[in-house]
Amino acid sequence: SKVDASAAQKALDYSQKALASNSDNLIATFDGGNNQNLWYGFNNAREGYMSMGKYFVDLLVNKNDPRLSYFVGEDANGGYSGSAPEDADSDASVFGNYFAGTASTPNIIVSYSEIKFIQAEAYFRLGQTLLAQAALKDAIVSSIKDVTGTTDDMYATTASATVTLENIITQKYIALFTTAEPYSDWRRTGFPNLTPNQESQTKKIPVRLITPKSERTLNANATVVS
């Protein structure tokens, strides 16, 4: 942490008391009736409303990631493509079945792979490179197992070969896609290395929710940062 120099050791200590394997994952289950998978419900009610992003899809394609076909649906041409921020590409891929295949598809809330990514970063910040690499590989292996049902040791070995903060956080971003955690990671680390939408007014990626005009007008003393 940029604020607390002891945060890495604390994160390591706490994480070692948490999930010990994929079987310990905290999962939200859905009965498929009135209680449906939220991504499924969203997509079912708004078919074609939201496409996959170009950055994420290209990242998986370029890495030949085994989770690609699970995370990303085929596009109109039978391949995998995403929309750039400034584009309205109706032919781009949509969410894959891993997230919203059926009304009863479960969602992972906290995973063993997330714990291992936390440990990988903590070890890296503590200068323990070999332990960081081992934790990073375990995190990737666990994520692939969660998503595909199989292991891919060769891919995980290659993906964990570079022990840098950027690679750790980028791999974590892939594994935790659709969760809020990668946004927090990006705000505190700057990774993954994203390019802001140059068609936007600010040409910057927001780092917090924008305060509405009514709030700034009626409660100005509490909204001076906006």
Regions found by a protein language model. Give the residues of each.
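C-terminal functional modules
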Residues: 144-146, 155-226
